Each structure stands twice: as C-alpha cells, then as structure tokens.
C-alpha cells in the first residue's frame, strides 16, 4: 500500500479492504468457498460462532488500521456470505460485528470513510444501514430498489448484475440506466453488484 500510495496521483483515493467476521468464519470452517457446499451451516454452535466472531472483529480492525496507516483512504468491508445467515442470527453474526468494526474505525480515523457490502441480505439491507451506519453501502443485484430507504446519509454503490456485461450492448446500457435513473437524486457510485464473470 505504501508503494502504491507513493505512485498514485494526489486526486485518486486508495481503497483498502477486508473480509467481515462472518465471511472469514465461513472460509475457515468450510476450508474454502461455501459456494457449492453449505453443509457446515447445520453444525454451527451459536455460542462458539459468536466467540470466534468477536475475536475476528478485533483482528479485522487491526488489519484495517494498518492499511489506513499505510495509506488507504477508504476501507471496504466485504460480508460476501451474509446471505447464508438465518434471519434469527443476522444481528449477532452480521450486523453487530460490522457495526463494531465500523464504529471503531470512525472513532480512531474520522477522515477515512468505510463502505460495507453485506451481500445477499436483501430485505434486511435498510436495517443494516440504520444499525451499522457506514459511509457507503454496496448493493448486490438481488436488492429490490423500490424498497430501499433513500432517506439517510449513506452513499450507495453497485447493483448491476455482471451477467449483463456478457449480453448485447442494448440490454447492458438499459440495465445501467436503470440504476443511474433510480439514484439520480442521491449520491451514487455506479458499479456491479458483484465481481466480473469470466
């Protein structure tokens, strides 16, 4: 990061990132991506999960802190597997851990914005924003735009399904316009709702 920062133009921001506690935990337990194997979810013991998540919170904050000290202007927290969490556990496994990390970064680095990406929480996105209070929120392509609460101070980012990059140009531009038109009166960073497909 220090080397990149030195070569980066002054008007360009450097974004650091980290996985959120739940997402790191899924990789640890599953020994890899849970994309095709979610059997591990059946054997989770809530008390043990919370204990590990609390430990990860601390380590992730340190990781983010070191990135900021090395030159990162912004931090993005990726909770890529938040969509696997049952609603009854969402607050303890996703909302509270992200909130704790965001709050600590805000307190110690008030000039460094934080973006959160709780992928897959869909109907619970408004509550996540209200509770966690990030500066920015990345949304995935399954979010119902009409149900988003736009009456808050958060900057929205993303949304477009990457599959449209593989289709014809007309559909791709129409999909892009859908997001640009929806957020036209709101601070918005156009982006995909997840990674680029191969």
Where in this protein do the model-derived segments appear?
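Active-site loop segments of alpha/beta catalytic cores
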Residues: 2-198
